C-alpha cells in the first residue's frame, strides 16, 4: 500500500476555482459524503464574508451560495447520509440547507438559548445529534445539543435544544468534534485550554465527562485518531500540538503521547519555514497520523506524527500565494482540496498533469473579520526567537 507521504508528494493541481465577485478568505472545506450516479460531487466552503459556497468538485465552479445574514457563519459540515449542509451562526442558530437546491432559506433551523453566539459545531456520525459551542457570555460557555432528525409527525423547520452542558468550559468553545463511528462520543476544545471528552449517552454532564486534557492554550483544532479512534490530537492558536491516548485512561500508562508547546521551534524544516499549523490527517488504512502546516507564502507541509515527535516529510508548492487556511483530503481518490487567504480553491490529484495559472496575492481583510477567524500570530514566536 502506498504511504500517504508518497501520495501527498505525487499531488499536482488539476483545477483552480474561478474568481468570484467578492473574493474572500476560504476558512473551511467539506465534501459531500454521498455519491449519486449522474450527479456532481459537491464541495462546501466557508468564506470569511459569512457565507457558504457550494462548488462542483470536478469543475470548481460555484453552484450556489448560502448566507447567515445578519449573523456570521462558523464551520461547515455535510451530513453523512444526504446532501444537507450545516453551519453554526453568531445569531444563535445552527442552520441547515439542501446543498442541491438554490434556496436562500434554511430547510432546518436549530435555535439556541437567549444570548447564545455559536462559533463551533458538529453533527454525529448517524446524523441524529448536533452539538454547538458558544462564545462566553457573562459566565456561560455552553455546549448545546439538538435532535437533528426530521419527524414525520412534526413538520416544523425550527427546533429547540435538547439541553446543554454548562459546567465544563470557562471560555469560548472553539472546537466540537464527534467520534467518527461512535455517535455518543464527542470532544470539545476551548480558549480555556481544556479538551473535554463526553459520552452523551449518560444523562448528566458531570457523569458524561469521560476525561479532561489540558493544552494550556487556546484550542484551534481537535480530531480523533488511532485504531478505533481512541486517540485525540489538538492544535492551539499559538501553534502547539498535543496528542492523547484514551486507551490509557484506566491504566498506569501515560495518557499523553506527545506534547509540543510550539511546533515551529522543534520541527526541522531544513531550508524551509513553518509559519502555522492547519490541521491533522489520520489515515485509517495505514494507522498513521499526519499534521499539515504551511508558510505565509502558500507552501503546504506534511509532517509525520509519532511519540518521538513531528517529522517534516514533503511539501506542496506552486499553488497558493498566501496563508492556507483549510484543506480536505478524500480517501476514495487520494485527492486534496485546499483554500486560503488568496481566495483560491485548488483541487490536487495524484500523478496529474500540473495545471499552470496566475497566483493571486493575499487580500486585505477587515479587522472585525480578522478577529472572528482567529488569525494565527507570529508575534510570540518572533519574540522568543530574539531572546
Curated annotation (Swiss-Prot):
List the GO biological process terms. Answer: corpus callosum development; ventricular system development
Query: What residue intervals traverse the membrane?
Result: none
Q: What PROSITE patterns has UniProt attached to this entry?
A: WD_REPEATS_2 (PS50082), WD_REPEATS_REGION (PS50294)
Q: Which InterPro entries did the record assign?
A: WD40/YVTN_repeat-like_dom_sf (IPR015943), WD40_repeat_dom_sf (IPR036322), WD40_rpt (IPR001680), WDR89 (IPR039328)
Question: In which ranges do the WD repeats occur?
Answer: 21-65, 68-107, 112-156, 168-208, 214-254, 319-358
A Pfam family that the UniProt record links to this protein: WD40
> What keywords were assigned to this record?
Repeat, WD repeat
Q: Highest taxon of the source? A: Eukaryota
> What PANTHER family would the database entry show?
WD REPEAT-CONTAINING PROTEIN 89
The name this protein carries in UniProt is: WD repeat-containing protein 89
Its gene is WDR89
Amino acid at each position: 500500500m502506498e504511504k500517504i507521504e508518497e501520495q501527498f508528494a505525487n499531488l499536482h493541481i488539476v483545477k483552480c476555482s474561478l474568481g468570484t465577485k467578492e473574493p474572500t478568505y476560504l476558512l473551511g472545506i467539506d465534501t459531500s459524503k454521498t455519491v449519486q450516479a449522474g450527479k456532481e460531487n459537491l464541495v462546501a466552503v466557508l468564506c470569511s464574508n459569512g457565507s457558504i459556497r457550494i462548488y462542483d468538485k470536478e469543475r470548481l465552479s460555484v453552484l450556489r451560495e448560502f448566507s447567515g445574514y445578519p449573523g456570521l457563519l462558523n464551520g461547515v459540515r455535510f451530513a453523512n447520509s444526504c446532501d444537507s449542509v450545516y453551519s453554526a451562526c453568531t445569531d444563535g442558530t445552527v442552520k441547515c440547507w439542501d446543498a442541491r437546491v438554490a434556496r436562500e432559506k434554511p430547510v432546518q433551523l436549530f435555535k439556541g438559548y437567549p444570548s447564545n453566539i455559536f462559533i463551533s459545531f458538529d453533527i454525529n456520525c448517524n446524523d441524529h445529534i448536533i452539538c454547538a459551542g458558544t462564545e462566553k457570555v457573562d459566565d456561560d460557555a455552553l455546549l448545546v445539543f439538538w435532535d437533528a432528525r426530521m419527524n414525520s409527525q412534526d413538520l416544523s423547520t425550527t427546533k429547540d435544544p435538547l439541553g446543554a452542558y454548562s459546567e465544563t468550559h470557562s471560555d469560548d468553545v472553539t472546537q466540537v468534534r464527534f467520534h467518527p463511528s461512535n455517535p455518543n462520543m464527542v470532544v470539545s476544545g476551548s480558549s480555556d485550554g481544556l479538551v473535554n471528552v463526553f459520552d452523551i449517552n449518560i444523562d448528566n454532564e458531570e457523569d458524561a465527562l469521560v476525561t479532561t486534557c489540558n493544552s494550556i492554550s487556546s484550542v484551534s483544532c481537535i480530531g480523533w485518531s488511532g485504531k478505533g479512534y481512541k486517540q485525540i490530537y489538538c492544535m492551539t492558536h499559538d501553534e502547539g500540538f498535543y496528542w492523547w491516548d484514551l486507551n490509557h485512561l484506566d491504566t498506569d500508562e501515560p495518557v499523553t503521547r506527545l506534547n509540543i508547546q510550539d511546533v515551529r521551534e522543534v520541527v526541522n524544516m531544513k531550508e524551509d519555514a513553518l509559519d502555522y499549523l492547519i490541521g491533522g490527517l489520520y489515515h485509517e488504512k495505514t494507522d498513521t497520523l499526519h499534521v499539515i502546516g504551511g508558510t505565509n507564502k502558500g507552501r503546504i507541509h506534511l509532517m509525520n506524527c509519532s511519540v518521538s515527535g513531528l517529522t517534516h516529510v514533503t511539501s506542496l508548492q506552486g499553488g497558493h500565494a498566501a496563508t492556507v487556511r483549510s484543506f480536505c483530503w478524500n480517501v476514495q481518490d487520494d485527492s486534496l482540496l485546499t483554500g486560503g487567504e488568496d481566495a483560491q480553491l485548488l483541487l490536487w490529484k495524484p500523478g496529474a498533469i500540473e495545471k499552470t495559472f496566475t497566483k493571486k496575492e493575499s487580500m486585505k481583510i477587515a479587522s472585525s473579520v480578522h478577529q472572528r477567524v482567529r488569525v494565527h500570530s507570529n508575534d510570540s514566536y518572533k519574540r522568543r526567537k530574539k531572546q
